């Protein structure tokens, strides 16, 4: 085992409780330290909640800069079959299927939406500064040279693609696109969930699907 993706999700106890991790903050960091001691390269995932403000984003950015690991930032997104799908009290402001990709906010944000995306991308820029561009090229020079000798340029181009992919204006534009497929609404909020029913999606036939007979056949 050389690489590990670790779902830390939050760097504070309140965030862990929100994401129902059922683990202490100390235990999370113990797992990270143990992986480091084994020489495993760790990629960390954190979840940005729509309720974050500028100060919260700044705290997370500084933490990401202070550690050597790659940190990925995703957006808190309830999915059918998960616990948060039935316990989340915040109403979704969109059910556009395309936006349920953990890079778009489908629940109301505390900040104006465009400001939330600007802070999100600014935080994700830490990944770009630390691990892409020239920083990545230094560690992959032999690999890059081999690709170039074979006329393959995709790897090199990828190292500088961050700004064309992570762009708050593109995220806002996604919200303005006409909705083609809409997610079925979640059930009424429940305080307690039967764990046996999680991650099990019963067949609902054509319910909630905007597909006609001609398209389906």
List each language-model region with its residue ranges:
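Conserved C-terminal portion of the radical SAM core fold
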Residues: 1-12, 21-84, 122-148
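Alpha-helix N-cap/helix-start and coil->helix boundary motif
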Residues: 12-13, 113
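Short, glycine-/aromatic-enriched active-site segment of Class I SAM-dependent methyltransferases
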Residues: 16-18
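Radical SAM enzyme core and accessory elements
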Residues: 83-97, 101-217
